[in-house]
Amino acid sequence: MIFSLYLIVAISLADLTAAQQECDCKNRFCFPNVVANWIGAAEYCSRNGWRLAILDTEEKQQQVEEQAQKVDAFKTNKVELWIGASDLAKEGKFVWHGTGIDVSYEKWIAGMPDNRNGNEHCVHLWYEPSRSFQWQWNDVVCSSTRRFVCERM
């Protein structure tokens, strides 16, 4: 039993270390090899001296797109990544986590945000060429899990 516990801790620490190494780079943005819900993603970035990405300009959006296209794990048919926007405080008013600044620059998928079923409050980047989604934004349920983008502060 104790051996199993040590093994689980060792594996978890190895995963965390590998994920942290992906953020020990000179780039402004990083993509930890971690899957979390939106709050967990924000906490992970913060614990490691980063923040969930604030894509408040077209330039920052393009930087994330360019960097993401270089990540081997993202060379698939579908990628979804948390970013730091939500309307958790007030429905329909999207702000950047950590700053509280209103989202002004945006790159929503047509018809989004839609708050489907009344519980989509967190924003993710969505890349799925077969559906013509090219790193656009969508609102989704915050408790769903996916990888995410951290930004150096």
UniProtKB/Swiss-Prot annotation:
It is found in: Secreted. GO terms for cellular component: extracellular region. Induction: Down-regulated after blood feeding. Residues 26-151 form the C-type lectin domain. Expressed in female salivary gland. Not detected or low-level expression in female midgut and fat body. Keywords: Disulfide bond, Lectin, Secreted, Signal. Pfam families: Lectin_C. The keyword Acyltransferase does not apply. Transmembrane segments: none annotated. One of its GO terms (molecular function) is carbohydrate binding. Its cofactor is Ca(2+). SMART domains: CLECT. Residues 1-19 form the signal peptide. It comes from the Eukaryota. Disulfide bonds join C45-C150, C122-C142. Salivary protein with carbohydrate-binding activity; exibits high affinity for D-mannose. Agglutinates host erythrocytes. Probably participates in mosquito innate immune responses to prevent microorganism multiplication in sugar and blood meals. (Microbial infection) Agglutinates Staphylococcus aureus in vitro. This is Salivary C-type lectin 1. It comes from Aedes albopictus.
